[in-house]
């Protein structure tokens, strides 16, 4: 097992809240970029944070620190959202985002959080339905920020509008918005990044790459039945029938009352003779 793979294995099994988001994101990228120097990129992020920290007064307020962070990340360093080619897989690999200074909400959020934490801000990722956001904790509450929109602050009405586009004919009140603003655990952030990649690779017909992403999600979430179902479908497309059978069966063990349990049972019955031919 390679050194990055060993590091990923340790990280995937950790449920600690202080896991480095940058390290996890770079280890995801190391699957695609053989020989990627993860530590070199971590040092670059550390240096970005150090440069900004040295400029700030020790008694700076949270609001002032956020203004300084936004100016530094978006104006000086030049990070921005890739609205022209949103589904370019490079937007999901942190090494590429650091090099190209362009990304999607979740990778920009990782950069933003990592630099912000190095200047003393309490920042958390928020797995909001429309796209990934950042929460900054204050003494008197919290601010929701959108790194994809250059760190714009979002109020309840802004968030309601974003949710209303998804929840047709359902009134989205403040309590519903609040329910989506819980800080995301590192494993959930990594899983969301990998799901993005899986979707991109499936769309491109790159099923082996999609399978690699899916397997990493399973490592992060071994109790999530849906992820075994997703991986089983990829195994089927690759004609890995035994592996597909194993995952479908595990899916039903984890979720015997699944809505699609009858469909999965049929898939198992159809795959069993195909797998038997391989003996």
Residues covered by each model-derived region:
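A structural boundary/capping signal
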Residues: 1-279
